[in-house]
Amino acid sequence: MLMRKVPGFVPASPWGLRLPQKFLFLLFLSGLVTLCFGALFLLPHSSRLKRLFLAPRTQQPGLEVVAEIAGHAPAREQEPPPNPAPAAPAPGEDDPSSWASPRRRKGGLRRTRPTGPREEATAARGNSIPASRPGDEGVPFRFDFNAFRSRLRHPVLGTRADESQEPQSQVRAQREKIKEMMQFAWQSYKRYAMGKNELRPLTKDGYEGNMFGGLSGATVIDSLDTLYLMELKEEFQEAKAWVGESFHLNVSGEASLFEVNIRYIGGLLSAFYLTGEEVFRIKAIRLGEKLLPAFNTPTGIPKGVVSFKSGNWGWATAGSSSILAEFGSLHLEFLHLTELSGNQVFAEKVRNIRKVLRKIEKPFGLYPNFLSPVSGNWVQHHVSVGGLGDSFYEYLIKSWLMSGKTDMEAKNMYYEALEAIETYLLNVSPGGLTYIAEWRGGILDHKMGHLACFSGGMIALGAEDAKEEKRAHYRELAAQITKTCHESYARSDTKLGPEAFWFNSGREAVATQLSESYYILRPEVVESYMYLWRQTHNPIYREWGWEVVLALEKYCRTEAGFSGIQDVYSSTPNHDNKQQSFFLAETLKYLYLLFSEDDLLSLEDWVFNTEAHPLPVNHSDSSGRAWGRH
């Protein structure tokens, strides 16, 4: 027993204690109890002691995990001040504010709670930006849509009366016919292929293809802005609902960087700028994040194919090459992704492309079509203003215009390239037709692709800002190239143009083999008609445009949509069973604009990406804030 071990203590009996000894024992015991319990209740609170009961904080990909404090109910996360890094959420908490109002976390990824497809809650690896969803509160970057719209110089849908000399009833009827064609194309797609990438009108089903990496609904997103500007309100709401409910980004295939950018991101960006609907902005930014791994190359020149599954840039071998028109047609969209997200990564990626191209030596001032993303050297000396090269030149002049005419680098690059093209590629046939040939190491192929027919409109668009002594020359050059492209249509049985046409052996502006005689609903010729019309108001461009409308109706319209044809030189051509998404995005849009007032999507306020999706010009105010950015 305890008392037996006290020195000098002799009990009177084996179990007895004298009264004074009992008193001393009780006094000692009470002091001991007081000391122990007093320390427990009276000592000041110590956060260090509290940490002894906490498991160490660990991080897992995409999450910040904190162990629960035993015996304590989780407290709600407090809203942090605007600038300092926010505190970690309370242990064990799944606070809706951590996913409804995500914030940047220095040194870590966002803590999110998925509310649907997994990709809606997870940023692309290595280039994450603050998540945002419809209805978000406290998002660190806000785009002021109303301020942006107030800076436009014309109403989006226009107000001015048509200034042509044609009877208004005739122009209105032509415009309504094109609107009906769009409505028919959309309704056919919705009935037989809704959610698929494109419609196959002969077999009345959908087609996915393999260049979108598993993404679906290319026709939906390509159609959004066309439906909006034609005021097909019910159809637009159908498309918008599909994007919000069914357009998912959790795909795992390999995708064309170029096609996803111009169709999906371009379509989503333009839909947002036209309507202010957050669903379009958010989807565009999230999809843009998924494209960023394509730029992880030794030079920063992106590879043409990106894997949505691994995030790799794909096929990264020393012998592979990137295509000029593909890596050169990202600038417009990526600047707007930065504009709408606040993430400078997008803009930095395309500025680096510009930097590489400025430094590299160019043969005779020309830009070959293939560049190694590994070495940064040209792979071949094949130069074309048609396929493989086309939209690179287009994006130079449009970058200048979209910047509010402040991007001097783009302007200089464009006019330098145009001078080289004139010097080495421009030709006039014996029959007087002006065309742009293809250049292969100094040897010319005297052919012009349908894709190159956009160049008439491009040159017209850039004529105003050329040196004064060159402006009239460029206007005339634009008109002559556009006339040549019209001839390629006029010289076919269907009055539709072939995929490519030649100038040799006494034959001009015609295809020389069946493999180049097809027409797949391409827009480039009517695109140039639209630009030339807006610049000159020469009625010939509306006449030529109406010829295309009639030919489309006669040879391409089927029971269930529009189809390309296999031979433009046959009066009874076979169909290719494909309604291209760009037919709704571009061909019908440009035709509609051709027969509309000039301030419907005024060129003072908008530039069109190479898929005809309108993106706004930067009308900066004196404070330097552009496009409503805060």
Swiss-Prot record:
Chain intervals with Basic residues compositional bias: 102-113
Catalyzed reactions per annotation: N(4)-(alpha-D-Man-(1->2)-alpha-D-Man-(1->2)-alpha-D-Man-(1->3)-[alpha-D-Man-(1->2)-alpha-D-Man-(1->3)-[alpha-D-Man-(1->2)-alpha-D-Man-(1->6)]-alpha-D-Man-(1->6)]-beta-D-Man-(1->4)-beta-D-GlcNAc-(1->4)-beta-D-GlcNAc)-L-asparaginyl-[protein] (N-glucan mannose isomer 9A1,2,3B1,2,3) + 4 H2O = N(4)-(alpha-D-Man-(1->3)-[alpha-D-Man-(1->3)-[alpha-D-Man-(1->6)]-alpha-D-Man-(1->6)]-beta-D-Man-(1->4)-beta-D-GlcNAc-(1->4)-beta-D-GlcNAc)-L-asparaginyl-[protein] (N-glucan mannose isomer 5A1,2) + 4 beta-D-mannose; N(4)-(alpha-D-Man-(1->2)-alpha-D-Man-(1->2)-alpha-D-Man-(1->3)-[alpha-D-Man-(1->3)-[alpha-D-Man-(1->2)-alpha-D-Man-(1->6)]-alpha-D-Man-(1->6)]-beta-D-Man-(1->4)-beta-D-GlcNAc-(1->4)-beta-D-GlcNAc)-L-asparaginyl-[protein] (N-glucan mannose isomer 8A1,2,3B1,3) + 3 H2O = N(4)-(alpha-D-Man-(1->3)-[alpha-D-Man-(1->3)-[alpha-D-Man-(1->6)]-alpha-D-Man-(1->6)]-beta-D-Man-(1->4)-beta-D-GlcNAc-(1->4)-beta-D-GlcNAc)-L-asparaginyl-[protein] (N-glucan mannose isomer 5A1,2) + 3 beta-D-mannose
Binding-site residues, Ca(2+): T610
EC number: 3.2.1.113
Keyword terms, alphabetized: Calcium, Disulfide bond, Glycoprotein, Glycosidase, Golgi apparatus, Hydrolase, Membrane, Metal-binding, Phosphoprotein, Signal-anchor, Transmembrane, Transmembrane helix
Entry keyword annotation includes Lyase: no
Enzyme class: hydrolase
A Pfam family this chain is assigned to: Glyco_hydro_47
Record topology, Lumenal segments: 44-630
Family: Belongs to the glycosyl hydrolase 47 family.
Protein name (record): Mannosyl-oligosaccharide 1,2-alpha-mannosidase IC
Organism from which the protein derives: Homo sapiens (Human)
Phylogenetic placement of the source organism: Eukaryota, Metazoa, Chordata, Craniata, Vertebrata
Gene (UniProt): MAN1C1
